[in-house]
Amino acid sequence: MMVRVMRYKKVPVKKIVNKIIDECDVILLVLDARDPEMTRNRELEKKIKAKGKKLIYVLNKADLVPKDILEKWKEVFGENTVFVSAKRRLGTKILREMIKQSLKEMGKKEGKVGIVGYPNVGKSSIINALTGKRKALTGSVAGLTKGEQWVRLTKNIKLMDTPGVLEMRDEDDLVISGALRLEKVENPIPPALKILSRINNFDNSIIKEYFGVDYEEVDEELLKKIGNKRSYLTKGGEVDLVRTAKTIIKEYQDGKLNYYKVDLKKYGQDRERDISFITKYLKDFPFIEDAKMIVTHLKDFDGLYKKIKKPVLGSEEIDGNIVVVSFGEKTKDACRKKVENLCRERNIEVLSKFGDKIGANNIYVAVGKRVKE
C-alpha cells in the first residue's frame, strides 16, 4: 500500500508577498521593537498603501523596551501601531481588536489578514498568540516558516503567514536581524561591532554594565576585552574573536543584550536566596579567598550532586569575604551572569571567580569585598 506524504511546497517569497497584498484586506508589518527602523521595509509599506489596504505596524518584543521609548516610536509610526510581546502574550488582545476595527472601517464583516516581516521578528509567534494554538511552525532559525499557510483568527477572519520578506541591503543588518543564518556568516565581527556601536551611541553605560568591561572606543580591542571576560580563548591563549562576535549577535537576537538597561534587582527575582546548604561546607575552609578552590572543595560533598528543583542565587560573608554563589542554572554561563549581576547590585568588588559543575548542578562562585560608597 502506497502512503502519500504531504510536503510543504516551497513558494518564492516575492510571489507570496504579492499574494498577500492582492488578497488580504489588513496587513500586519511585524517589526522588532528594539530597533523598528532596521526591521521595516519602506518599499513594501508604500506598495501596501498604494493598493488601498489597511497597514498595521506590530512592534514585537515590546517587553524589552521602556514605555517612554515605545511612545516615541508610536509618534513615528502613527496611530495604527500596536506594541506586543508574542512570547509573553502581551498586547495581542489589542491587536485583535485593531484588526476587527480595521475591517469594520472598510465595511467588511469577513476578511483576510496577512503578516509580513523579516525572519526572527516573531511573525509565527504572533500567529500562535493570536489564535491561542500552535498552528504555525515557529523557531529561532531564519526561514523556518515554510510556504503558504492559512490560520483562523475568528470564524470570519483568516490569517496568512509568510516567510521573511528580504530586500537587498547591508549584509551586516541582515545578519543582525537574523535574515542570514549565523552559522553561515563567514565574518561575524563587523555586524557584532555594529550592534555594539548602536548600543554605545544610545547609552554608553550599557555595554560596560552588561559585559563588565571598561572601554574608550567600539573596536576589535573591545571585542578582545569581552572575549577575555567570557574566557573565550583559543588553544594558544588568544581571544577567540569569532566566538565572541557570534555570542554578541546571538545575545542581541535573543533579547539579552539590547538598547535598554535591565533592572538588575529583577534579574534574580525568581531565585531562592538561601545558600546556607552550600556555605555550611565552607566553615573553617582555609582558602576562602580562592573561588576555584571553593568549587573544588564543594565537589567532595555528595549532598550537592542531586539536581535541585529551583536555582539558587545568594551571598554570605565568611571570614571577612563576601562569597556569591549561583547554583542549579541550566548553563554555567547563566550562573556566571547571575553572580556578576548580583555583585554589581550589591557593590561587591570581585577578587576571584570560578564556574564548574557539581553532579547535575552548574555552579559559579565569586569571592570579593564590599566596596564602600
From Swiss-Prot:
GTP binds at G117, Y118, P119, N120, V121, G122, K123, S124. Signal peptide: none annotated. InterPro entries: G_CP_dom (IPR030378), GTP-bd (IPR006073), GTP-bd_ortho_bundle_sf (IPR023179), P-loop_NTPase (IPR027417), TRAFAC_YlqF/YawG_RiboMat (IPR050755). Keywords: GTP-binding, Nucleotide-binding. One of its GO terms (molecular function) is GTP binding. The keyword Nucleotide-binding applies. Disulfide bonds: none annotated. Residues 14-168 form the CP-type G domain. It holds the Pfam family MMR_HSR1. The keyword GTP-binding applies. Belongs to the TRAFAC class YlqF/YawG GTPase family. This is Uncharacterized GTP-binding protein MJ1464. It comes from Methanocaldococcus jannaschii (strain ATCC 43067 / DSM 2661 / JAL-1 / JCM 10045 / NBRC 100440) (Methanococcus jannaschii).
